[in-house]
A protein has these predicted regions:
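PLP-dependent aminotransferase class I/II
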Residues: 1-130
Length: 130
């Protein structure tokens, strides 16, 4: 099952790097580690003409489930606001990732045709939101 998740994540990553580099940053996995992917995440670049919510709404309307990323911004969570803890820095990068990163699933029951559908809908969205 993990091999299929990895295949799906790598397929999306390769396509994002080759075709969507103008719009998104993607994680590059360290070759010295084995990763277990549940989602493929990508972060909007600062100069995008659209935001995460716009893209998420488009993908969701096409039956592609998306999720945001928490990205280490626990102090911003309502249930943790009154907890005492040490916060180092202003969490600027964590907040940027939280606000501009989107995740799509790479479940083992999804095949390459499903990944191609995600890419088709990305193309559709990007062609109208350059």
């Amino acid at each position: 099952m993990n091999k299929i998740r990895l295949r799906n994540a790598n397929y999306l990553r390769e396509n994002f790097i080759n075709y969507y580099d103008k719009f998104f940053e993607v994680q590059i996995a360290d070759v010295n580690y084995v990763h277990s992917y549940y989602t493929f995440s990508f972060t909007l670049k600062e100069d995008c003409s659209f935001n995460r919510k716009m893209l998420s709404l488009h993908l969701e309307s096409k039956g592609i489930e998306t999720r945001p990323m928490m990205a280490g911004t626990l102090p911003d969570q309502p249930g943790l606001r009154n907890c005492n803890g040490i916060i180092v820095g202003d969490l600027k990068n964590s907040r940027y990732v939280r606000d501009n990163t989107l995740c799509v699933g790479v479940h083992p029951l999804l095949d390459i045709q499903d990944m191609d559908y995600v890419l088709e809908e990305m193309n559709d969205f990007l062609s109208r939101n350059k």
